[in-house]
Regions:
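Short, glycine-/small-residue-rich phosphate/pyrophosphate-handling segment
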Residues: 95-96, 109-155
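N-terminal beta1-alpha1-beta2 submodule of the flavodoxin-like/Rossmannoid cofactor-binding fold
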Residues: 1-113, 153-183
Length: 183
């Protein structure tokens, strides 16, 4: 079983990184292969809205803008489940997460029931390291993504610097439970 953890923070040692490690550890405890894709290191640009907003994404379910998106998209499609971890910036996912997820949404949501993410379990983690504000609105936008691509919302977890310790444990437990549920 292959779990992809999408990380969208420029930091490798902050709250978001700790959430990623907790998810990977939890999935691996249950015997899954879990690996991280660091979106910030993947050279993924924003959607160009080709051809009046509907380029190859609508009919071929692939993005014609060549960059790191193709590799990430393929890994996501080939995975059995996803964990999306983002820092909260201004009540939203990070810019790098939005770049990936906007393009992913266009490629997969347009496929309807043939979306390659249809029924795929997803854990969404929003990590607010500063004020702790914006968690609910960030998770709401992550939930819309999950709905649009036809994936299955397994868990939605908010984390801030005050609840960090027990929420890291929660993330690991959630990833482990997701793996167990797919057996």
């Amino acid at each position: 079983m292959r779990i992809i953890v999408l990380s969208s923070s420029p930091n490798t040692d902050g709250l978001t990184a700790a959430c990623v490690r907790a998810a990977i550890d939890g999935a691996r405890r249950e015997g899954a292969q879990a690996s991280e894709i660091r979106i910030n290191d993947s050279d993924i640009g924003m959607c160009k809205a080709c051809d009046n907003g509907w380029g190859t994404c609508r009919d071929e379910h692939r993005c014609k803008v060549e960059d790191g998106f193709q590799k990430a998209h393929q890994a996501i499609v080939e995975s059995d489940a996803l964990v999306l971890v983002t820092p909260v910036y201004w009540g939203e996912m990070s810019e790098s997460a939005k770049a990936l997820t906007d393009r992913l949404r266009r490629c997969e949501a347009t496929a309807g029931e043939k979306s390659r993410l249809q029924g795929k379990p997803v854990i969404a983690v929003a990590a607010a390291g500063g004020t702790g504000n914006g968690l609910v609105s960030c998770l709401a936008s992550m939930e819309r993504l999950i709905q649009h691509v036809g994936a299955k919302r397994f868990d939605m977890i908010s984390v801030n610097r005050w609840n960090r310790e027990y929420k890291l444990s929660t993330i690991g437990q959630s990833a482990a439970a997701m793996v167990r549920g797919m057996r």
